[in-house]
């Protein structure tokens, strides 16, 4: 089993499915543990479990000064994936928790697109 700990700087621009729909624009730093099976020719399976601290560009956002834990995975075939799924728990500054399910698709080594879904 191959384990990789990665420090990741990222920006999240997403639609959040809460009681009401909305968007947030957060950035942060995190650490991710990944399991990767590389079969070559752009074919691989990836699972990940990571934590990050976030700051939102809108200081009134519930996601400002929050942390998150996400667990998910995807399978690349020919360098492309259509099946990324996962779930994140956001720990908000006021002590509350928000759960978000997500789905994504894209091309390995590049940005992708994703949508959040209600659970």
Q: What is the role of each PLM region?
A:
Residues 1-2, 18:
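Intrinsically disordered, low-complexity Ser/Thr- and Pro-rich stretches
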Residues 2-10:
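Sec-dependent signal peptide recognition
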Residues 10-18:
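Hydrophobic h-region of N-terminal signal peptides that target proteins for export
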Residues 19-119:
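Beta-strand-enriched cores of mature, soluble protein domains
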């Amino acid at each position: 089993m191959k384990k990789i700990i990665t420090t990741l700087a990222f920006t999240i621009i997403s639609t959040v499915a809460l009681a009401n729909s909305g968007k947030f624009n957060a950035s942060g730093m995190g650490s991710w543990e990944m399991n990767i099976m590389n079969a070559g020719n752009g074919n691989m399976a990836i699972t990940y479990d990571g934590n990050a601290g976030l700051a939102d560009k809108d200081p009134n956002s519930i996601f400002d000064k929050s942390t998150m834990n996400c667990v998910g995975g995807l399978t690349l075939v020919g360098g492309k994936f259509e099946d990324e799924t996962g779930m994140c728990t956001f720990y908000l500054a006021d002590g509350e928790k928000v759960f978000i399910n997500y789905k994504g698709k894209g091309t390995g080594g590049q940005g992708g697109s994703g949508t959040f879904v209600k659970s």
